[in-house]
């Protein structure tokens, strides 16, 4: 990865769409990573608990995020937004796992039933695996500055808001302090696609 702490995550999907490989702290040229995890897309997408402690330094074992779910699951893709709908829960990272008691099996819920014991839990943080839902009664078309959005949502924001109302979002990863991030496909290196 880059100097300093970065996830530098990467996902590769097999041409037959049967397998996906997650990469953690991938070098910019994509030739090296600190961890690699292969997932079978015909399974439930949830890793089994490890018989030994999580070891991020071993590229043959471990997950590429704090929780045992693939990077692809919960990802907002370019194709979904262009199609105008997202038909699954989103995954998000939050800066709530910092200080306090050691993170243990009792501070996560399914599907995040195992987690990295090297990170610490903030007493005010939700448990990994908790699902949050945007109030389905909120009007995503409200354009008033006094409404719930403080103005009009863009077309893409409406698609994400609708998915949050219908499916919610699941807490799967730690992020920086006071930071909340929804996972969205990076199209930076594809000149044919743009989020703008």
State each model region's role.
Residues 181-196:
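Extracellular low-complexity, O-glycosylation-prone Ser/Thr/Pro/Gly-rich "stalks"
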Residues 2-165, 169-176, 187-188:
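A surface/extracellular/periplasmic glyco- and lipid-processing/surface-interacting theme
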């Amino acid at each position: 990865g880059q100097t300093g702490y970065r996830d530098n995550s990467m996902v590769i999907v097999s041409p037959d769409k049967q397998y996906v490989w997650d990469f953690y702290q991938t070098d910019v040229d994509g030739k090296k990573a600190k961890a690699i995890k292969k997932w079978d897309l015909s399974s439930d997408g949830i890793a089994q608990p490890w018989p030994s402690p999580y070891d991020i330094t071993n590229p043959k074992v471990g997950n590429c995020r704090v929780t045992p779910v693939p990077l692809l699951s919960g990802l907002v893709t370019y194709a979904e937004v262009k199609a105008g709908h997202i038909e699954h829960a989103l995954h998000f990272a939050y800066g709530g796992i910092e200080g306090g008691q050691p993170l243990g099996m009792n501070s996560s819920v399914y599907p995040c039933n195992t987690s990295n014991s090297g990170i610490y839990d903030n007493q005010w943080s939700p448990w990994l695996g908790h699902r949050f839902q945007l109030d389905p009664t909120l009007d995503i078309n409200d354009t008033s500055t006094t409404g719930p959005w403080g103005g009009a949502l863009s077309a893409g924001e409406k698609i994400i808001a609708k998915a949050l109302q219908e499916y919610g979002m699941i807490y799967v990863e730690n992020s920086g302090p006071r930071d909340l991030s929804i996972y969205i496909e990076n199209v930076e290196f594809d000149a044919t696609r743009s989020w703008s």
